[in-house]
Swiss-Prot record:
Catalytic activity: N-terminal L-alanyl-[cypemycin] + 2 S-adenosyl-L-methionine = N-terminal N,N-dimethyl-L-alanyl-[cypemycin] + 2 S-adenosyl-L-homocysteine + 3 H(+)
Function: Involved in the biosynthesis of the lanaridin cypemycin. The enzyme can methylate a variety of oligopeptides, cyclic peptides and the epsilon-amino group of lysine.
Residues making up the signal peptide according to the UniProt record: none
Species this chain originates from: Streptomyces sp
GO BP field: methylation; peptide antibiotic biosynthetic process
Broad class of enzyme this protein falls into: transferase
Gene: cypM
The organism's place on the tree of life at top rank: Bacteria
Pfam families in the cross-refs: Methyltransf_25 (PF13649)
UniProt name for this protein: Cypemycin N-terminal methyltransferase
Length: 245
């Protein structure tokens, strides 16, 4: 699993700025809502970070339990929560131990790929299966692996503005043999420079189908965009819907 210390107190403000820009938010809500209602439903948001997706789900009427291993991330979430119906829980989402079950489970912005080994991914999917209500669904928001594979072994960098006075440069290096992607985020202001990174191991759709079956789940839908476009060879997103077998 990705090291939660990556998102420590020194980097958390920068991480929150980047997450607010990159996380799908409204797009995630639109996609989930096209498969399951959210208003009045319970949602387990795994790997919630500083709460960007959790807040969007709550604003759609869901009661959200937001789980993350990074205490600084959850502290930031709690500062920004206001009156949204979001409960923050610190924990490793490979080992879920809630007494309750949920209508919806979400993992946004490649959180599923932060489980590094296949065994970790299967353990994570088993935890999801245990915590889904009958008729519930889990939603894995993933970049299509072809996007990573096109990079080869060469580093690629893209710079985005963060408001009026900061910018972030995202540098990614892909290891196609190991199915790994290293993303380095460099947030720059006039007098500040903050860096953090994420190490992810992607899985193909065929691998997700197999791991899901092992874990007691099945893939019941795959979309190519948050707007529900079909998943094709040209899709940049791989949005996977899972249900209990």
């Amino acid at each position: 699993m990705s090291d939660p210390s990556v998102y420590d107190e020194t980097a958390i403000e920068a991480y929150d700025l980047v997450s607010s820009m990159l996380s799908p938010g409204a797009g995630l809500v639109a996609w989930v809502s096209s498969h399951r209602p959210l208003d009045g439903r319970t949602v387990l948001d795994l790997g919630c970070g500083t709460g960007v997706s959790s807040f969007a789900l709550a604003e759609a009427g869901a009661r959200v339990v937001a789980v993350d291993a990074s205490r600084p991330s959850l502290d930031m979430l709690e500062k920004k929560r206001l009156d949204r119906d979001v409960e923050a829980v610190e924990g490793d989402f490979r080992d879920l131990t809630f007494d309750s079950t949920f209508d919806v489970v979400t993992m946004s912005r490649n959180t599923f790929f932060l489980a590094q080994e296949q065994e970790e991914k299967i353990a994570l999917l088993r935890g999801i299966a245990r915590h889904l209500k009958p008729g519930g669904a889990a939603f894995l928001d993933c970049t299509d692996p072809a996007e990573f594979q096109r990079a080869g072994g060469d580093a690629r960098s893209v710079t985005y503005p963060l408001g009026r006075d900061r910018m972030v440069t995202v540098t990614q290096t892909a290891d196609r043999a190991g199915q790994q992607i290293l993303s380095i985020f460099l947030v720059q202001g006039a007098t500040t420079l903050t860096a953090f990174h994420e190490q992810a191991t992607w899985a193909t759709l065929a691998e997700i189908r197999l791991m899901a079956r092992i874990a007691g789940l099945e893939v019941t839908g795959v979309d190519g965009s948050y707007a529900g476009e079909p998943y094709t060879a040209r899709s940049r997103e791989m949005l996977v819907v899972l249900e209990r077998q």
